[in-house]
């Protein structure tokens, strides 16, 4: 579900109109975060760290209302929930796009996410933008150390 944000009473209205004029109105911040304790806990429980941090980031995104905002046809919509659309590696060296519903309960999220990962690993090609507007796109590249990433984006294609 979603609801239209009331632009007349929104404190960020002027900021929205100003930055909406930019071809690329996005900004990003990167930071090093020590996840050693969480990583070690996952490994001790034979739990996927990827799915653990994916769930925790979705938990935070769903808690913070502006992370659930989406701009559609010039209007700001507030979704009740945002979900994940991560890239999933395949045995042939390619990747596919997955869609994972957010669940408060980590174990339920884990069960459903594993099923979706297996589904994507057994497909070929790409299915972009099938997840809808209320997703966060994720890419995990654990084999390199980096402090920033920029994703390819086509502004003419609603994504």
Residue ranges and their predicted role:
Residues 90-146:
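Helical lid/core segments from catalytic subdomains that handle acyl or acyl-like groups
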Residues 152-159:
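Intrinsically disordered, low-complexity linker/assembly segments
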Residues 60-67:
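Short alpha-helical functional segments enriched in proximate histidine and acidic residues
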Residues 2-5, 20-49, 68-82, 135-138, ...:
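Gly/Ser/Thr-rich phosphate-binding loops and adjoining beta-strand/alpha-helix segments
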Residues 10-15:
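Basic, often amphipathic N-terminal segments
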Residues 67-99, 128:
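Small-residue-rich loop/turn and linker elements
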